[in-house]
Amino acid sequence: MNITRFSIKRPIGICMIYILVCVLGLISFFRIGVELLPDVDSKFISVIVNYPGASTESVEQQVTKPIEDELSSISHFKQVRSATRPGRAEIFVELDSQADADMVAIEATKKVSRIRKNLPEDIDEPAVLKRSSEEYPIIQIAATSKDNLDDIFALADSSFKERLQQAAGVADVDVTGGRTKEVAIEVDKDKLNYYGLTLQDIITAVRKENVIVSSGSVYTDALEKTVRLQAQYKAPEEIQHLQLKGAGGRYIELGQVANVQAKDKRAVAYSRVDGNEAVSLEVYKASGANIVDTADGVLQQLETLRKDYPDYVFTVVYDQSHFVRDSLSNTLKTLLEGLVTTGLVLYLFLRGWKSSMAVMIAIPTSLIATFFLMYLAGFTFNMMSLMGMALCIGILVDDSIVVLENIHRFLAMGKSADVAAEEGRNEIGMAAIAMTLCDVVVFLPIAFMQSATGQFFKQFGLTIVFATLMSLVVSFTLTPMLASRFYKNGVEEPKGKLWSRLDDFEAQTIAKYDVLLRKCIEKPKKLVLGVLAAFAVAVALVPLGIVGSEYMPRTDESAIQVNIELPTGFNADQTNEALLLFEDYLAKVPEIEHYMTNVTTTQSMGKLVIALKSSDERSKDVWQVAQEIRSFAKQNLGEIKVRVNEIQSSVTGVSGGRNLVRSPVQVELKGSDMDQLVADSAKVEQIFASTAGLKDIKNSYVKGMPELKVTVDRDKLKYYHATVNDVAQSFNAAIGGRSAGVLANDVQNHGNDTDIAVRFAGGSGYDIEDVRAIPVQTGRGSVFLGDLADVEEGVGPITIRRVNKERIINIQCNLTDRPLNEVVKELTQKLNAAGLKSTYEFSGQATTMNDSFAEMAMALSLSLLLIYLLLAVLYESVFTPFIRMFSLPLGIIGAIFCLLLTHNTINLYSLIGILVMDGLVAKNGTLLLDYTLTLMHEGMTAKAAVIEAGKTRLKPIFMTALTMVVGMLPTALSLSAGSETRVSMAWVIIGGMITSTVFTLLVLPILFLWLKEKFPSRI
């Protein structure tokens, strides 16, 4: 039985079916998750190892390389990167999209544990994290109180951190700032030499005397009791009386050679919020976790902390989920605005509430049914899926308008409502199926692209496919059924001046179109040549740079990060002073809501995270504020390097990473010769500086820090019966101090363990002679380090970066107002002419843009091929579908000119807009072509058929184009959070729909008649 006839005959049954579908859709609506972007982040496993006191090259050789080698064989391995700094190694492995981060983290832990015995004994235990060490925190919180900073830090590093980590989706919480306590054993070097002792002797003695030993069990007739030797230190005073055996067997107390006291560790990290000292907590989400859900969990835990610690103030400085929520809310708002404006247009064109009501019932029904399919597919509500739904409005309206307009035509012939509904639907059944399947094959290639970009747009494409298929079903069932009920008494034409004028306008438009079309058919050359010229000019605008291209539009996310870098050798105190000057300026900027300062253990570097007020509460956008900050830094901070980055979560999400402050232009130099890499990086930096449109240039290589190099004399080691390890232990202990255990459950430290550190008194002020005088215990007694090794001054690297086990230097910068493609093209020419001896390649957005654009071009080509094949099957002709294919070039004319007029660019979103436009404009061509063939089969000549088809389909074609344009205007004109990404796509669709609609009604008839004349038997 015909499905349309069944729907008309069984209205109650159809209503019940759609009520069930809507119930399932609404249930799904409340169960679908929410996030900014589809989860296409590459998954990472990071290994962090601290090696106190070790140089960069020592850490690289002894820690980084062995771990890199071991992790390179891990499951789902994609690539390994590392950053090695003095005393710290960060190795992070990028995994493929199929990886289970939890399982791979377990595997990584096992692999690192297996080689632990081959790593230096003095390293801290390696930490394996389910995130990239370069990932950006999703929430940054500052804790302040009237208590001392050491008390704040103690609570933050234990209770606060632990509480926040309980939130689902949290991978890690970094605590910065404040002060940590320690029991410092500061040794008098001269007294130590006098008694013939070394620092290692003290370290060993402290460790041996600070133990809990289980001694077994004792038994009575009724009980078994364990015996435990309790010998842990309770207070620093106990350590002071520790007995040491000096030279000649003489015993002394530790207090005779050292001062033992509880104190704050030397400040190597500062943190402030809005100029007040604080402890910062940076929350990182696990790979694959939902940002909104994770942030909700963190904020809930934060509320419990506020209740449990009323004397503490917790300030949320940065919360990425705010932008996510605002962006999604605004996307949903534009969707609803588009729906309302579409309804108004329909009311005017369909003459009254009945037809409009039929469409306004059909559209939400299709959308609600789509929720159910999205839920089954595991989709979330994000910018892409909601954007797909917003675009669907035009597609869904299109289906309903075509059906209702044709039903109106049959009603005007005097047929009953039931007959008109059935025959009106069936007459255009083939065209409807063709149009719907065209939409499906347009978006399927996008949905199944394998790259990160393809995965990013998967939900966008499939959401449109789901909605389009549901719309097709609705147009065959619900819409005809509603029409048969609404028009039971025929079409009631509304009365009044407005409707009369609309009728007159419609009749005049059709008459003028008839005249114009006949003139174009009689003299087609001018129109065809004009269209070809317009197409050539439009396409030329892109390579000429008049319409620029970039990877992604910039977004104002109300957040800025400032990184400062002082000349090499400056310490944390000096870096802190520079940041204090910066804070004085920021406190006076009215657009800023909060700012948080961090100076970390990389002593000559610091950062500021700046949260701006919401966009509707400030007069300047984020780029204007950032530029003013750059100007201040240039005028007031002298030689200090300052980089200002606008935080961009919506851009990095597409490129598969979460470093929200990474620059769009990056060049990586690779090679084994570090000196050559350094020389080439200086050339690249100069090229960047001489290229217009670039700012915030940063070279990852920093001139080495001054260092003292100790070169052992192996002959002397042999003579004194000493080893390299003896020298290393004594040297490291003297310079950086060594841990000698902990003061367990220290009541003075909120019950936390307090580190016991052994070092020389005044150890931070060593010169070369002090180093040579460091005592080393050998087989022949205690000697000076200078007796065993040569000590000389030198320079060592600050950071060594590696990619896939090869050293690299990264040079990056931000853009001003030049399109990314122009900059990359110019840089490529300059770099090729520079005579670089190292291998170079672009990374970041430049690479992603080229790859994504190429893949999008392939998807567009595949879509066109699939559409052609589909139409060839439906029409059983190889020439007829060829006519329809001209709809896209006709649309591209308006799309590119619209980008030019609105100052937008070719980017990933505007390319998607071209794909969407292709599916939409194809409907007009298919509708016109299908009715022309129908009339020819009824006996009309080709010319008469094409003119009559144009006149008959003018109204539905114009209505669908207008509703699509009006429906897209709220998106195109939006100034809300996150709208920047959608604007270019909306203008492409608007411009493409306008020119394609006009030219389709004129050019396609000419092309059809020309092909009919040339190949009469094949059309």
Protein language model features and the residues they cover:
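Helix-loop junctions and hydrophobic alpha-helical segments within the transmembrane domains
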Residues: 317, 324, 328, 404, ...
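Solvent-exposed, membrane-proximal periplasmic/extracellular interface segments of envelope transport
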Residues: 58-130, 190-211, 232, 573-661, ...
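Structured binding elements
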Residues: 47, 164, 460, 985-986
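Transmembrane alpha-helices and their membrane-interface boundaries in multi-pass membrane transporters
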Residues: 393-407, 429-448, 455-499, 608, ...
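Extracytoplasmic/periplasmic membrane-proximal domains and adjacent transmembrane bundles
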Residues: 6, 37, 48, 90, ...
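Signature of alpha-helical transmembrane segments and their immediate interfacial
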Residues: 1-34, 428, 497-551
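Membrane-proximal juxtamembrane linkers immediately C-terminal to transmembrane helices
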Residues: 33-49, 84, 131-137, 176, ...
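Hydrophobic transmembrane alpha-helices and their membrane-interface caps
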Residues: 24-30, 35, 340-409, 466, ...
